[in-house]
């Protein structure tokens, strides 16, 4: 089992449905501890997908992780770290055709 399962909301833009692709992001960081106390770094430019479960409706077209260090106006000498992952999801139209169009 993975150490954690994250569920996230992604706004879907349906302009080209069912031949669309979506860009979903997930930002991981901490507001409790700053970058002088905790260090977070991605293991590489792409997330580990060893526990990824494929879907009949979507496929991963691209995915990357980016490390950020931000100094906010409240505390300019204190960095706050995060890793933001971007996932480009490509809809598989066969799922829509088989489950919606054909039954009609």
Curated annotation (Swiss-Prot):
Reaction catalysis annotation: K(+)(in) = K(+)(out); Na(+)(in) = Na(+)(out)
Localization per Swiss-Prot or TrEMBL: Postsynaptic cell membrane; Cell membrane
Keywords: Cell membrane, Disulfide bond, Glycoprotein, Ion channel, Ion transport, Ligand-gated ion channel, Membrane, Postsynaptic cell membrane, Receptor, Synapse, Transport
A GO term for molecular function: extracellular ligand-gated monoatomic ion channel activity
Chief place where the protein resides: membrane
Signal peptide: none
Subunit structure: One of the alpha chains that assemble within the acetylcholine receptor, a pentamer of two alpha chains, a beta, a delta, and a gamma or epsilon chains.
Physiological role: Upon acetylcholine binding, the AChR responds by an extensive change in conformation that affects all subunits and leads to opening of an ion-conducting channel across the plasma membrane.
Protein family per UniProt: Belongs to the ligand-gated ion channel (TC 1.A.9) family. Acetylcholine receptor (TC 1.A.9.1) subfamily. Alpha-1/CHRNA1 sub-subfamily.
The protein's name in its UniProt record: Acetylcholine receptor subunit alpha
């Amino acid at each position: 089992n993975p150490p954690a399962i994250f569920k996230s909301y992604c706004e879907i833009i349906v302009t080209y449905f069912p031949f669309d692709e979506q860009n979903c992001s997930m930002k991981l960081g901490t507001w409790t501890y700053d970058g002088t106390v905790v260090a977070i770094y991605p293991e590489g430019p792409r997330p580990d997908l060893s526990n990824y479960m494929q879907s009949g409706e979507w496929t991963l077209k691209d995915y990357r992780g980016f490390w950020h260090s931000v100094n906010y106006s409240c505390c300019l000498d204190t960095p706050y770290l995060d890793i933001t992952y971007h996932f480009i999801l490509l809809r598989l139209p066969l799922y829509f055709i088989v489950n919606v169009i054909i039954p009609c």
